[in-house]
Amino acid sequence: MRRTVPRGTLRKIIKKHKPHLRLAANTDLLVHLSFLLFLHRLAEEARTNAFENKSKIIKPEHTIAAAKVILKKSRG
């Protein structure tokens, strides 16, 4: 099984940024899952950008451009 961020550490980080929120027992797992899904979408978009630019390597420019697109879509 893959190692993840310690749950207690993730809960402390969330509480530090939003101390007034009451968190459910599985909130840290949902945040971690959202993070992994974001990374997956970012990697796919960066790969597409690299392919469109006829590059075999994903460069920082591809990742930055992908991040802008993904974050714009995520704002909802």
UniProtKB/Swiss-Prot annotation:
<dbReference type="GO" id="GO:0007059">
    <property type="term" value="P:chromosome segregation"/>
</dbReference>
<keyword id="KW-0137">Centromere</keyword>
<dbReference type="GO" id="GO:0000776">
    <property type="term" value="C:kinetochore"/>
</dbReference>
<comment type="subunit">
    <text>Heterodimer with CENPT; this dimer coassembles with CENPS-CENPX heterodimers at centromeres to form the tetrameric CENP-T-W-S-X complex, which is a subcomplex of the large constitutive centromere-associated network (CCAN, also known as the interphase centromere complex or ICEN). Interacts with NPM1.</text>
</comment>
<keyword id="KW-0131">Cell cycle</keyword>
<comment type="function">
    <text>Component of the CENPA-NAC (nucleosome-associated) complex, a complex that plays a central role in assembly of kinetochore proteins, mitotic progression and chromosome segregation. The CENPA-NAC complex recruits the CENPA-CAD (nucleosome distal) complex and may be involved in incorporation of newly synthesized CENPA into centromeres. Part of a nucleosome-associated complex that binds specifically to histone H3-containing nucleosomes at the centromere, as opposed to nucleosomes containing CENPA.</text>
</comment>
<dbReference type="GO" id="GO:0003677">
    <property type="term" value="F:DNA binding"/>
</dbReference>
<keyword id="KW-0498">Mitosis</keyword>
<dbReference type="InterPro" id="IPR052484">
    <property type="entry name" value="CENP-W/WIP1"/>
</dbReference>
<dbReference type="InterPro" id="IPR028847">
    <property type="entry name" value="CENP-W"/>
</dbReference>
<dbReference type="GO" id="GO:0000278">
    <property type="term" value="P:mitotic cell cycle"/>
</dbReference>
<dbReference type="GO" id="GO:0051382">
    <property type="term" value="P:kinetochore assembly"/>
</dbReference>
<dbReference type="GO" id="GO:0051301">
    <property type="term" value="P:cell division"/>
</dbReference>
<dbReference type="Pfam" id="PF15510">
    <property type="entry name" value="CENP-W"/>
</dbReference>
<comment type="similarity">
    <text>Belongs to the CENP-W/WIP1 family.</text>
</comment>
<keyword id="KW-0132">Cell division</keyword>
<keyword id="KW-0238">DNA-binding</keyword>
<keyword id="KW-0539">Nucleus</keyword>
<dbReference type="InterPro" id="IPR009072">
    <property type="entry name" value="Histone-fold"/>
</dbReference>
<keyword id="KW-0158">Chromosome</keyword>
<keyword id="KW-0995">Kinetochore</keyword>
<dbReference type="GO" id="GO:0005654">
    <property type="term" value="C:nucleoplasm"/>
</dbReference>
<protein>
    <recommendedName>
        <fullName>Centromere protein W</fullName>
    </recommendedName>
</protein>
<dbReference type="GO" id="GO:0046982">
    <property type="term" value="F:protein heterodimerization activity"/>
</dbReference>
